[in-house]
C-alpha cells in the first residue's frame, strides 16, 4: 500500500514528491514487534570532496556557506524507485508483484486524473523555473 501510494503521488502531486527524489521507510513487523528502517536516499558521487565542491562554487575554504538550491552540484542520484523495490522485496507479503502494486499509478498516468489547483500552480512554477535555468531547453 505504501509503495502504491507513493507512486500515485508521483503522478498526482509531482511538485510534492517525485521519482527523482528520495524515499525513507519505517516498517513495524507485528510478528517480531520490531521496527525496521530503509534509507532510499540518493547518493552523491563517491569521488567528490568538499574541497572540490567549494572550489567549483567559488566558496573559500572554511567559509560558512550552503549549497545553492539551483546548482547542478546540489543534485544526487535519485533513490526513490530503488527504495520502492527494496520495500516490496524486504517488507512485502509476497502476494503481489511490483507490477501489480504499481498498476493503479500506471493507470492514472495513462488515463489521466483531475488536477488540483495546487498541482497546476506547482507545475507552472516548475516550468518557469526550468525555463529560467535552461533557456531554450
What does each model-identified segment do?
Residues 2-137:
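Noncatalytic scaffold domains of N-terminal-nucleophile
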Amino acid at each position: 500500500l505504501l509503495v502504491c501510494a507513493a507512486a500515485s503521488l508521483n503522478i498526482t502531486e509531482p511538485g510534492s514528491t517525485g521519482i527523482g527524489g528520495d524515499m525513507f521507510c519505517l516498517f513495524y513487523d507485528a510478528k517480531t514487534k520490531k521496527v525496521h528502517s530503509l534509507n532510499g536516499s540518493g547518493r552523491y558521487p563517491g569521488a567528490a570532496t568538499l574541497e572540490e565542491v567549494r572550489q567549483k562554487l567559488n566558496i573559500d575554504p572554511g567559509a560558512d556557506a550552503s549549497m545553492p538550491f539551483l546548482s547542478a552540484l546540489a543534485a544526487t542520484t535519485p533513490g526513490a524507485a530503488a527504495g520502492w523495490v527494496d520495500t516490496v522485496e524486504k517488507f512485502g507479503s509476497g502476494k503481489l508483484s511490483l507490477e501489480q502494486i504499481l498498476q493503479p499509478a500506471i493507470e492514472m498516468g495513462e488515463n489521466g486524473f483531475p488536477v488540483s489547483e495546487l498541482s497546476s500552480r506547482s507545475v507552472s512554477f516548475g516550468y518557469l523555473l526550468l525555463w529560467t535555468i535552461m533557456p531554450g531547453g
